[in-house]
């Protein structure tokens, strides 16, 4: 990662302007061409520096629902369960934790009922218990990771 990548990622953490040509405005801010930004984003996604780049939507006002869930997955089955979840569009992401509950995942669906159905399906197909940890409150902390 070079200095331009750092400047780009630091700036992107504060969002894109909501306008017809956001990358053109960003290019003017960063003193580069729009194509440079798009190419760098592709490169950062390709090399794994970024795992995702896209909008975040507050799905609840639109009728959607999400939850955080956790599982205790035997090490011998961890990759199997991760691969199972990778094919489910309802699973936004899953990740390993060094804890008895070693797999955590975010489930996002069109409705609370679909969240419950997805977690029940996961229990059926994996044979493992799933701990549902729904959001109790929303906090906006302005998280930023300076690079």
Swiss-Prot record:
Disruption outcome: The nirDLGH mutant lacks dissimilatory nitrite reductase (NIR) activity. The NIR activity is restored by adding purified heme d1.
Extent of the signal sequence: none
Segments crossing the lipid bilayer: none
Pfam families: AsnC_trans_reg2 (PF17805), NirdL-like_HTH (PF22451)
Enzyme class: lyase
Annotated keywords: Lyase
Family to which this protein belongs: Belongs to the Ahb/Nir family.
Subunit structure: Probably forms a complex composed of NirD, NirL, NirG and NirH. All proteins are required for the total conversion of siroheme to didecarboxysiroheme.
Entry function: Involved in heme d1 biosynthesis. Catalyzes the decarboxylation of siroheme into didecarboxysiroheme.
Protein known as: Siroheme decarboxylase NirG subunit
Naturally occurring in which organism (per UniProt): Pseudomonas aeruginosa (strain ATCC 15692 / DSM 22644 / CIP 104116 / JCM 14847 / LMG 12228 / 1C / PRS 101 / PAO1)
Gene name tied to this protein: nirG
């Amino acid at each position: 990662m070079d200095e331009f990548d750092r400047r780009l990622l630091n700036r992107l953490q504060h969002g894109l302007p909501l306008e017809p040509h956001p990358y053109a405005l960003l290019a003017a801010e960063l003193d580069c061409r729009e194509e440079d930004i798009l190419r760098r984003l592709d490169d950062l996604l390709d090399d794994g520096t970024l795992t995702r780049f896209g909008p975040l939507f507050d799905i609840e006002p639109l009728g959607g629902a999400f939850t955080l869930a956790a599982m205790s997955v035997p090490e011998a089955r961890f990759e199997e369960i991760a691969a199972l979840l990778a094919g489910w569009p309802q699973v936004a992401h899953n990740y390993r934790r060094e804890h008895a509950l070693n797999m955590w995942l975010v489930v996002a669906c069109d409705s609370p009922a679909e969240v419950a159905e997805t977690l029940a399906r996961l229990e059926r197909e994996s044979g493992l218990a799933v701990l549902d940890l729904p959001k109790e409150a929303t906090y906006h902390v302005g998280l930023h990771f300076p690079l």
